[in-house]
């Protein structure tokens, strides 16, 4: 695009600007301060054409610097036109839902010029929306070079800094210090905007967690679907008026990277989650979410009841049945008849003592006297069989056994089994004792034992140990074991000076028969062994051993 000079570029620049805004559906607002200093406007617009060619690349791949400082005689309208031109070239209007109103910027046309070449408030609002992420850690150098303090409106461009509890990716929408009434929004708003409040209606309220924008004047909490694009508390540039007003435009400020989020209709995984520092965040409390009812405890409670119910029913049926006593025998009939007499004669009232007295008297009776009671008992049995034909003595005895089983708690059964295990432990200890004795002999070889001096003692212990577990597999292995026994025998017959070597070589055979682990220790541990024992050891190492439960020959 050719450069325009200050003379004839005024008309062309103005027509080009009007055509571009008509394409985007934006109506340029006319203000009373527009008709001043035509020559200055021409110079500014010619410089804007040059800057638009330099900055026409994507705003995502490069960090745009602040515009060069202007002279103090420039007017706020110049920066307004610069803002619209740079916005259009940097692809601000990519978002399809809110293409007509990408951001809010109310120019402060009545403001005075600031000293030392500072920018007007409208330029500050443009810069703040043009670079919403200047407060990120990667731009610390820009912070240091541009603003010593975020809220101080000096001759430097103020950089936005959020409070510590706000999300770093939250672009802020700024307002000018002009108060305006909460009028109705224009008629060309998109259908998704509420005409009463001017705030976009939530398209997917169940998917998006809203923020609640609060003004210093305690504006009512209004849910917003785009919570990360709504102005939050602690905004350092321009605060919302304390009267509390409704904004007629949707609160959006998008660069090229954010327009892709708008085009994708704000899928839940792309929207940053609200930070927990805000007390008005829309994260649902865990108690509000309906929990999944776990039915495992209830099913666990039902199954024992179902199991125990039949047994309870059976017990109740048994209790309903009357207890049928067995027919009395001859002795019981005698006791029934004579018990009152014995109680009257004796001062004892214990039933055991009375029963002993009745038993002695029963045995002292003659056969004829006893026969009388046996006859009565026979008649009693006949009468009982007629009354209860299906009765059996097993019913009563079975009930007693069941009662005993119910009375016995499972703890008693556990203690019984433990006692049985303890009774078997001494036998196991007797099997383990030879290995421990051999281990002690190998650990302390300086004390020769008298039992190893006699050749018969090891053989007896070997035969006893070989019965539960014998490591014999083939006749060849048995022959090799006999060689080891002979080596131990020769070592025991050696003179007293070689008693130490005998005590070390003799345990070679016994661990072989008891356990395989002492075999390696006994082979490796003795430093000096009799030559015959050394000849037998390679044979034992070459032959593999296996566990056999059969008794040895």
UniProtKB/Swiss-Prot annotation:
What is one Gene Ontology biological process annotated in the Swiss-Prot or TrEMBL record? Answer: Wnt signaling pathway
Extract the PROSITE patterns matched here.
HMG_BOX_2
Give the CDD domains listed for this entry. HMG-box_TCF7-like
Q: How is it modified after translation?
A: Phosphorylated. Phosphorylation by csnk1e promotes binding to ctnnb1 while phosphorylation by gsk3b may reverse this effect.
Compositionally biased region (Low complexity): 444-463
- Chain positions covered by the region annotation Interaction with CTNNB1: 1-61
Positions of region (Disordered)? 1-77, 183-213, 392-474
Amino acid composition bias (Basic and acidic residues), ranges on this chain: 17-32, 52-77, 407-416
Compositional bias segments (type: Gly residues): 1-11
Provide the alphabetized UniProt keywords.
Activator, Developmental protein, DNA-binding, Nucleus, Repressor, Transcription, Transcription regulation, Wnt signaling pathway
Residue ranges of the annotated DNA-binding region, renumbered to this chain: 324-392
* UniProt feature, compositional bias: Polar residues: 464-473
- Function per UniProt: Participates in the Wnt signaling pathway. Binds to DNA and acts as a repressor in the absence of ctnnb1, and as an activator in its presence. Required early in development for the establishment of the dorsal body axis in response to maternal Wnt signaling.
Q: What is this protein called?
A: Transcription factor 7-like 1
Native source organism of the sequence: Xenopus tropicalis (Western clawed frog)
Gene name of the record: tcf7l1
